[in-house]
Amino acid sequence: MQFSKMHGLGNDFVVVDGVTQNVFFTPETIRRLANRHCGIGFDQLLIVEAPYDPELDFHYRIFNADGSEVSQCGNGARCFARFVTLKGLTNKKDIAVSTQKGNMVLTVKDDNQIRVNMGEPIWEPAKIPFTANKFEKNYILRTDIQTVLCGAVSIGNPHCVVQVDDIQTANVEQLGPLLENHERFPERVNAGFMQIINKEHIKLRVYERGAGETQACGSGACAAVAVGIMQGLLNNNVQVDLPGGSLMIEWNGVGHPLYMTGEATHIYDGFITL
């Protein structure tokens, strides 16, 4: 099987062309390939498939390192766009793809940046999914070690966002897995820890479900900005600094799609026998 190793701000991926080669992965195979000592090593596996809808260009599938399939990965979306362009699978600047939970448009810009239309944030608790009687800007979550206030939103996948005073000392290692597996998130959740520098600049760490803390999480950056805007803490254009680098997030509020812009880097191509 041919593959490419790529990363978006240090969030690393193996990307596989499922259009021109036949590929099938079991969860066990994915876990073996994801192993950084005995396999290739990655945060997520991305598969490019032929479109299910003839009006779209591709179908986009995402698997976490633990073998679980998820419906969204923002950093992966940028790498997906870079991959299909580099491999000559398309020459379009605007690439329309489907995912498990909807469609998105990936735009390849001339300055090596990829702009992704992430769609509208979803706030209705049942659709996140999150257990709550109604939408609120802040929810109280109790864990074994502390009670936190968080915002909850879906960016095609579930996120909770906790505001912290100092991103460096935030208790991500202990609190992250407790939030990820909290009973009020029936499909688990990506936990974001956000420090607000000013209304147009935040710092963020994300503990991703099925992957742990990563160098960057594109949908997590989108979720943090969306929550901050809904809470009246942020403006419409925000720079998000993650451990692996920075993203620009734009959102004009309810009823509008959210946009993420950032880099996508090709590292190497390889071949492996499954």
Curated annotation (Swiss-Prot):
Compartment list: Cytoplasm
Quaternary state and interactors: Homodimer.
Record site: Important for dimerization: Y268
GO BP term (any one): lysine biosynthetic process via diaminopimelate
Annotated Gene Ontology cellular component terms: cytosol
Pathway membership, UniProt: Amino-acid biosynthesis; L-lysine biosynthesis via DAP pathway; DL-2,6-diaminopimelate from LL-2,6-diaminopimelate: step 1/1
Main location class: cytoplasm
Domain of life of the native organism: Bacteria
Residues of the active site: C73 (proton donor), C217 (proton acceptor)
Known EC number: 5.1.1.7
InterPro entries, sorted: DAP_epimerase_AS, DAP_epimerase_DapF
Gene designation: dapF
Family annotation (PANTHER family): DIAMINOPIMELATE EPIMERASE (PTHR31689:SF0), DIAMINOPIMELATE EPIMERASE, CHLOROPLASTIC (PTHR31689)
GO molecular function, one term: diaminopimelate epimerase activity
Protein name stated in the entry: Diaminopimelate epimerase
Record-listed substrate binding positions: N11, Q44, N64, G74, N75, N157, N190, E208, R209, G218, S219
Function: Catalyzes the stereoinversion of LL-2,6-diaminopimelate (L,L-DAP) to meso-diaminopimelate (meso-DAP), a precursor of L-lysine and an essential component of the bacterial peptidoglycan.
Pfam families: DAP_epimerase (PF01678)
Site (Could be important to modulate the pK values of the two catalytic cysteine residues) residue list: H159, E208
Alphabetized UniProt keyword annotations: Amino-acid biosynthesis, Cytoplasm, Isomerase, Lysine biosynthesis
